[in-house]
């Protein structure tokens, strides 16, 4: 009886593992250089998180959740120095990517950035280009966060995928 149950179980588990070969996940770190008005009020940012992707031929679906920090600058306004606020942000992104060449891809993500300082949220829009060799994934991107203000930055993201 055990052999009768074990053989179908092994077959099903082998099929399931074969289907998951297009799935990857892992930690990432990123550096961010503010642009536009955001550059005038905040220092360079950094962050970390975890991401996942499902590869479907040349296309794929991506998702990530992380933490980012942008320190505030001291800005001279009129007769005094003003301390600009720092931002602690939890970005949640989903997107698509398309493999342009064996190791090069283009990516487009969207999502929500949650500002932990004041409990506000912003819409995320982020195009990027990346290279993935074995488990190392490096991406250059432009990211825009939009609510009643606009926060934009150039970013460099490095991930290890399992």
Regions found by a protein language model. Give the residues of each.
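Transmembrane beta-barrel strands of outer-membrane/channel proteins
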Residues: 27-33, 63-67, 96, 108-112, ...
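Outer-membrane beta-barrel "beta-signal"
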Residues: 24, 28, 105, 129-137, ...
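Residues that define the transmembrane beta-barrel architecture of outer-membrane proteins
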Residues: 21-23, 42-48, 86-92, 121-125, ...
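Outer-membrane beta-barrel strand-turn architecture
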Residues: 53-58, 98-104, 130-135, 144, ...
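Short glycine/proline- and aromatic-enriched beta-strand/turn motifs that initiate or cap beta-hairpins
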Residues: 18-60, 155-161
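Flexible, solvent-exposed loop segments that connect beta-strands
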Residues: 31-42, 69-89, 116-120, 149
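Cleavable N-terminal export/targeting peptides
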Residues: 1-24
């Amino acid at each position: 009886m055990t052999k009768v149950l074990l053989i179908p179980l092994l077959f099903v588990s082998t099929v399931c593992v074969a289907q998951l070969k297009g799935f990857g996940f892992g930690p990432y770190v990123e550096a961010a250089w503010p642009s536009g008005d955001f550059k005038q009020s905040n220092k360079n940012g950094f962050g970390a998180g975890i991401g996942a992707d499902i590869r479907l031929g040349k296309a794929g679906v991506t998702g990530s959740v992380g933490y980012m920090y942008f320190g505030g600058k001291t800005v001279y306004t009129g007769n005094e120095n003003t301390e600009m606020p720092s931002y602690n942000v939890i970005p949640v992104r989903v997107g698509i990517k398309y493999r342009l060449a064996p190791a090069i891809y283009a990516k487009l993500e969207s999502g929500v950035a949650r500002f932990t300082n004041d409990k506000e949220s912003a819409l995320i829009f982020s195009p990027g280009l990346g290279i993935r060799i074995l488990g190392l994934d490096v991406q250059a991107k432009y990211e825009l966060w939009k609510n009643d203000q606009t926060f934009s930055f150039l970013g460099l993201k490095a991930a290890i995928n399992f």
